Amino acid sequence: MSKSNQKIASIEQLSNNEGIISALAFDQRGALKRMMAKHQTEEPTVAQIEQLKVLVAEELTQYASSILLDPEYGLPASDARNKDCGLLLAYEKTGYDVNAKGRLPDCLVEWSAKRLKEQGANAVKFLLYYDVDDTEEINVQKKAYIERIGSECVAEDIPFFLEVLTYDDNIPDNGSVEFAKVKPRKVNEAMKLFSEPRFNVDVLKVEVPVNMKYVEGFAEGEVVYTKEEAAQHFKDQDVATHLPYIYLSAGVSAELFQETLKFAHEAGAKFNGVLCGRATWSGAVQVYIEQGEDAAREWLRTTGFKNIDDLNKVLKDTATSWKQRK
C-alpha cells in the first residue's frame, strides 16, 4: 500500500484495533432537514440541527471507531465526540443542482483540505455522483475535480475518502427494478475508475453493488438477481479495487444493512468496514422533535446503542482489516 506514514497513522485513528473502520456517518444536511421537517411545521433551525448531532456524538461515538461530520453543522459535535473516536469531515456541498444536467460536484467554498485538517479531521471525505454511462463532457469534469481534491490531500498528507453514489439520468427512481438491473456495473466500474493512482484516493466509500430488495430470498416482490448472481456482483466488486473500501448504509433499516454485510462476506467480499448513518440513528429524529432532548438521548442509549452494537458484532464476523489490501 503506497501511502505515506502520516496517512497510514491517520487511517489507523479512524479504525478499531482490528483494522476495521466502524464509522458513524452524520454529515447529512439536506436529508436531515427533510427528515426533521416531517415532524414539525417550521423550518429546522441551525441550533436544532447542531444539537441533534451533538447528542448523537455524545451518546454513540464511544462505540464507533470514527465519526463523519460536516463542517456546516457538525463542528460542535466533533468537539463532543469520545476522545478515542477519529474524525472525518465532509468537503462537499450537500445535494446537487436538480435543474442542471450531470449532478456536478461542488466543494464547500469556505473550506479546503488544509482547513479541514486544521479543524482536527483525520481524513477528508468527498461525495461524488457518478454514472459511468454519462457523456464524456460531464465525466471529464468530474474526473478533473477528483484529481484536484486528491492532489490537495496529498499536499496536506491527509487521507482522501471518496464516496461514490451511482445514478442514471434516464432512470429517475434508483429504487426501481430498472435501476437494479444496471446498478452492479455502474457501482463496480466507478470503483475501478477511481482506484487509478491519478486520483490519489485512499479509501472508497461505496454502495453495495445490488439492491438487496430485489435479491432472491430478500425480495418481497419481483426478483432481479438470484442469490448466485448477487454473490457474483459482490465478488466482482472486491476485485474492482486494490484500495480499502467501506460500505455506506444508504438509508436502509439497521436489520437489512446487517443482513447485507453477512451476504457480502459469504459472497467473498473482503470489505473493510462501514460508514453507517441513518441505519443507526434515524429513529432519534422524530423522538427529538416531538419529545425533546432527554427522550432522544434515551432513544440513543437504548435503540441507538443496540443498532450500533449489533452492527459492531456483525462487522467483527464479516469485515477484514484494511491493512490486508494492497
Swiss-Prot record:
Keywords: Lactose metabolism, Lyase. GO terms for biological process: 6-sulfoquinovose(1-) catabolic process; D-tagatose 6-phosphate catabolic process; lactose catabolic process via tagatose-6-phosphate. Pfam families: DeoC. One of its GO terms (molecular function) is tagatose-bisphosphate aldolase activity. Disulfide bonds: none annotated. Pathway: Carbohydrate metabolism; D-tagatose 6-phosphate degradation; D-glyceraldehyde 3-phosphate and glycerone phosphate from D-tagatose 6-phosphate: step 2/2. Its EC number is 4.1.2.40. InterPro entries: Aldolase_TIM (IPR013785), DeoC/FbaB/LacD_aldolase (IPR002915), LacD_aldolase (IPR050552), Tag_1.6-dipho_adolase (IPR005927). Gene3D superfamilies: Aldolase class I. It catalyses: D-tagatofuranose 1,6-bisphosphate = D-glyceraldehyde 3-phosphate + dihydroxyacetone phosphate. PANTHER family: SULFOFRUCTOSEPHOSPHATE ALDOLASE. Belongs to the aldolase LacD family. This is Tagatose 1,6-diphosphate aldolase. It comes from Staphylococcus aureus (strain bovine RF122 / ET3-1).
